[in-house]
Amino acid sequence: MNTQQLAKLRSIVPEMRRVRHIHFVGIGGAGMGGIAEVLANEGYQISGSDLAPNPVTQQLTSLGATIFFNHRPENVRDASVVVVSSAISADNPEIVAAHEARIPVIRRAEMLAELMRFRHGIAIAGTHGKTTTTAMVSSIYAEAGLDPTFVNGGLVKAAGVHARLGHSRYLIAEADESDASFLHLQPMVAIVTNIEADHMDTYHGDFENLKQTFINFLHNLPFYGRAVMCVDDPVIRELLPRVGRQTTTYGFSDDADVRVEDYQQIGPQGHFTLLRQGMPDLRVTLNAPGRHNALNATAAVAVATEEGIDDDAILRALESFQGTGRRFDFLGEFPLEPVNGKSGTAMLVDDYGHHPTEVDATIKAARAGWPDKNLVMLFQPHRYTRTRDLYDDFANVLTQVDALLMLDVYPAGETPIPGADSRSLCRTIRNRGKIDPILVSDPAQIATILAPVLTGNDLILVQGAGNVGKIARYLSEIKLKPQTQEEEQHG
């Protein structure tokens, strides 16, 4: 970015000129890193801290950010403001030091709100589908030549980044309800994909509180703004009369303003027709599998249509959509001869879904696109509280696969809860008599345990939000082949 462009950006909010150095605590998270990346490209001095390097910190370092792989008071020295992830506790030494030095400490959504303040903001909220829908909206606007800024919670594979600074008035951002901080945002357009009971600790276990928070988020829209909402979702249908803003509904339902018809999945692609009020029908080829992704695309089309984007640009963007990292992410197809001596191959797919609804959607997409495959899932439950609260739902969903390997619960900082662990969940599933799950206590043994399960016509789903994505990449690197001790030492 040249000096003239930077001066123009800085002039949007003159008071932000007082801010020179922005420090992020927990900078390696995708949501934090995306905002840091946009601000780095706007010319701000960026620093941050996290526990270990990852692709996000590597990208930020390449942009000139200073990253500390520790949490120490001196890391916030000279910072104008400290941005904190919701995963960071109040007693973090950097947070304590910032308060003592009277440095403002804000949550990531508050900084995102500043980026959005004088732009045309499009915020994507909902329990499931936010990241993919954000990527789809961004792809359509980019294809139409509108050069948007976007900040996403996952890797936008076509761009190779989580966030990008554009030079137009549009800012497209994932809005996170997990800590209710999306209430800081004041967009012009808001998508709500669905609403389910998740992150209930934030909402004191009260689902009505969660629903009202979504209403409050939508009422942050100006009176001339627009809420785009999935009418297939029963909670959204219930809340629609309480939304005091202009609305566009979408879904498979007959009464949707933008309606999906004739959905068919062939391999990794969805094919369907979109019916829009007062507009020509669109015959869509979507390069992403599953009815849930057809809904995500329909939300993106509804927003783009309202903006007057050309239909050809919409169709091109969806047909060439490259997806987002860890969302039905195809990692390869590998011959089994070196793995277990069998002929045939196994496909490897990595997916972030960690709620029963998301896992169910991934399984359905796999079954629809590859109905003859032996469906093998490696599942890592995420958080003891989620496993406890949705225990029966997990047990019901996970019995739909042909073979199940389960890792221990990824705690995400939580302490174990009796009966909400992987061993208990495996026992419950086994007692239902459909499949016999295998508990994998040592992730280093996963390839050895997986090999005899594979038949020669397999689709392996690596599923979860913890560190299971690293296991998926490892399995891809070794091409599923169990490693000898010597191979591991030279790997």
From Swiss-Prot:
Annotated EC: 6.3.2.8
Ranges annotated as spanning the membrane: none
Entry's localization field: Cytoplasm
Main subcellular location: cytoplasm
Signal peptide, first to last residue: none
Key words of the record: ATP-binding, Cell cycle, Cell division, Cell shape, Cell wall biogenesis/degradation, Cytoplasm, Ligase, Nucleotide-binding, Peptidoglycan synthesis
A GO CC annotation given for this chain: cytoplasm
Key word Cell division present: yes
Family: Belongs to the MurCDEF family.
Name of the protein in its database record: UDP-N-acetylmuramate--L-alanine ligase
Species, as recorded: Salmonella arizonae (strain ATCC BAA-731 / CDC346-86 / RSK2980)
Lineage of the species this protein comes from: Bacteria, Pseudomonadati, Pseudomonadota, Gammaproteobacteria, Enterobacterales
